[in-house]
């Protein structure tokens, strides 16, 4: 009798949540594999560029697979159905990689090198460097389809890649912390100050890049001089 009552009053919503958990666990493996694939390609590009140009464009990489809770919240906020099939269709940032570069030029260099690969397809691009957000946020966002090889064969998974400089990352991290502490509500005065800081940091970003380029030209000139005189010294 107790068993019959249990079956009668069982919440059908619990079934959908449990099914979604199982779907998430399965799909998480695909998204995690996509992140590993992107990270491996970025590390290879950074290493090869360093060998050829004596400069590492990438400072560091960060990555994450969005949690089931975050997925559900984002789907609810957008008004989309809350299911993993809906998440696959409507969300492009379940798998995310953040590429923190040294200089602004490095951002577009890395993006172009990655997008030049035949099996990488561009889904979406948002250039917040050319067009910063109203709060001052700057970064290059691209969403790409990357192939991953699972036991059931080749699958494609979208990965959102945020590419920014160390300075942009510094501002974004602190700005997020300030807004979180203020529960998302900050005065116009603070908003203006944060935007001003973003502008100052941007100016510094470009100045640092100019300094680096100037030093690079000096080193390149020195190397050229060494290449010209070395054969003569060897002949002597």
Language model segments and positions:
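An acidic, glycine-/histidine-flanked metal-binding catalytic module
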Residues: 2-35, 42-48, 159-236
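Short, charged low-complexity intrinsically disordered segments located at boundaries
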Residues: 65-75, 101-106, 140-147, 227-236
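Charged, low-complexity, helix/coiled-coil-prone segments
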Residues: 8-19, 41-59, 84-87, 143-152
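Active-site acidic/histidine clusters and adjacent loop/turn architecture
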Residues: 25-71, 76-86, 93
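Short linear motifs at secondary-structure transitions and domain/linker junctions
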Residues: 12-14, 18, 36, 71-77, ...
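Short charge-dense sequence patches
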Residues: 17-27, 55-65, 91-93, 150-162, ...
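Long beta-strand-rich cores associated with HINT superfamily self-processing modules
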Residues: 88, 101-210
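Terminal, regulation- and interaction-focused segments at domain boundaries
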Residues: 94-100
